[in-house]
């Protein structure tokens, strides 16, 4: 009856090195899921997207932006047929999720290695797992065809985030490079 579509190639480096995998997973895969849902008469589909789909600057963001267009196109078709309700959530980084930067920083500190960052001024919009689940459930309960739900989240620079993780571990000797 219901689908929560979270399958994605979500790591920026993976999408940069393998852009066709990003296309096949994030765009074509989503289209396949939505066509199957519509054909099967699924009542509601909630798709998960990312803040990187807004003004995308890398292959992952571009693929997720196109994924959203696929979602909205399928939502229109399904609504015209009076069937499946398809909506979408878009949020930033879920703290401590697989592939997020916080576990990487923790591993680097524990190993006695420097914390490596590309640019200390890069901004990340952060939410915890409960906030992410609440957003998805809100979309599930209240979504209309083609709706996009965006969670306003706290922002942090990568540099400040690295310093905060250092402080949590009582670490004063690890360099941030």
Question: What are the language-model segments listed below?
Answer:
Residues 6, 139, 143:
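AAA+ P-loop ATPase catalytic core
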Residues 70-123, 147-150, 174-177:
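Conserved beta-loop-beta element that borders a ligand/cofactor-binding pocket
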């Amino acid at each position: 009856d219901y689908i929560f579509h979270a399958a994605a190639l979500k790591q920026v480096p993976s999408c940069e090195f393998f852009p066709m995998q990003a296309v096949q997973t994030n765009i074509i895969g989503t289209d396949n899921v939505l066509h199957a849902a519509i054909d099967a008469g699924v009542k509601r589909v909630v798709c998960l997207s990312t803040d990187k789909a807004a003004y995308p600057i890398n292959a992952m963001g571009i693929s997720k932006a196109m994924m959203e267009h696929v979602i909205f196109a399928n939502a229109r078709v399904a609504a015209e047929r009076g069937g499946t309700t398809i909506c979408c959530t878009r949020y930033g980084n879920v703290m401590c999720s697989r592939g997020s930067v916080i576990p990487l920083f923790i591993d680097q500190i524990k190993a006695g290695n420097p914390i490596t960052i590309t640019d200390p001024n890069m901004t990340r919009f952060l939410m915890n797992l409960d906030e992410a689940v609440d957003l998805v459930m809100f979309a599930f309960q209240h979504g209309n065809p083609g709706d996009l739900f965006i969670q306003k989240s706290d922002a942090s620079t990568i540099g400040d985030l690295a310093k905060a993780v250092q402080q949590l571990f009582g670490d004063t000797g690890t360099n941030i490079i």
